[in-house]
Amino acid sequence: QDSATEEFSKPSPANKVAAAAKMFEVAWGPGLSAFSHALERIFHGPRPTALALRGLKISACLACALELDVAALSLVNALASFTTLDGPFKVMLPRNAACVEALLGLTAVPDCAENLGSAWLPVLRVASRVAHLRLLATGARTDDAYFTSTHAPDEKEYADRKLRDEESARALAAHSVLTDASLDELYARSTKLSAVGVERFVAELCAVSAAELSTGDPSSGTQYFLDESDLRPGGKYDDLQPLPALGDPRRPRVAALQRLVDVADMNVHLRPRLAWDRMWRVLAAHFARAGAHANADVATYAVDSLRQLSLKFLAKEELKAFTFQRAFLKPFERAFRANQGSLDRAPVRAYIVACLDVLVQARASKIRSGWKSILGVLKDASGDPDRAVSQAAFEALGRVLDHHLALVAPD
């Protein structure tokens, strides 16, 4: 044996994992073909289907545990495709419902969830579709109904109405698959992920949210991934130029955006500040984009979500020499500047000013580096061409000077 073979043959945990990974790299492709073939055969009985589904799920978990990203993404995408939810309308059979349970069940396996990486995207897209279909099945208003623009009906609207009628049948099948509590648990498990794991989870949830905001459908193919440059000083996150409005404003959804609020709320005081800062840079870039949505109601909703999170974040005092508050409040600056230049966007700008005024009144004693972001927005708003916006800004500045000047300039 040569030295390399001898080194590899030494019994150690690392070598065992490496050997398992090599074997799995050879086996997962043929295994995927066999399991997929079994699931595609409509006339197979329940037992072959159950065995194929179990094999596909175990294979996906193994790929994640061995950190084989390509294999994990391929296996998870296969599971997602067999749900029939992540794509155009198809009839949902019992085997498809079982695939939904198996796919979302991957998130309950710690080693699997931690290493899902880019495979979170198909999982979260299917979770979003299940939640939407559950609402349709119960007859409740879906979130897109609250943000639909009023306009004369056109051919596309009639096509959309027909599609919704077709989806009603699929909604009844999806309703029995998972409960609302099990969907909530999927997002609650983000608290158990590592700093790296939760950052990737949040980035993929942002991708789902961006697709929903663009078309109302998380499986539309629209993807929003942050480049590494977004997470560095001087990257897109720190660039305060106006942002392009997101997609078609006619029928956006905000379900994933609300889930982002929930995930941020669950993690804000759980994570060390440095880990939270990395996670927030991903969230902040997306919230700033949502705050520039072409649909003013959606933009206002995104700003209000930021207000809720800011009230909770600012409840904890900032240590000296840190600037976490400034980074946290920066999306308000980006959203305000992105909404400048149009009188039609004045209500959104006015709401941003009102939100910052609320933050000052409620959390002034806790604010440190955040003053820079707050005063920056109020300064821009004081010169706004819309009188209501400029007047609200001057009134907010007046309250800061009258009651909180010692906090703004303690020296």
Residue ranges and their predicted role:
Residues 34-46, 59-65, 81-92, 106, ...:
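Helix-loop junctions that connect tandem helical modules in alpha-solenoid scaffolds
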Residues 12-35, 68-76, 113-124, 179, ...:
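Core helices of alpha-solenoid repeat scaffolds
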Residues 1, 15, 107-247:
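Alpha-helical repeat/alpha-solenoid scaffolds of the HEAT/ARM/MIF4G superfamily
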Residues 18-58, 185-224, 228-229, 247-276:
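Extended amphipathic secondary-structure runs
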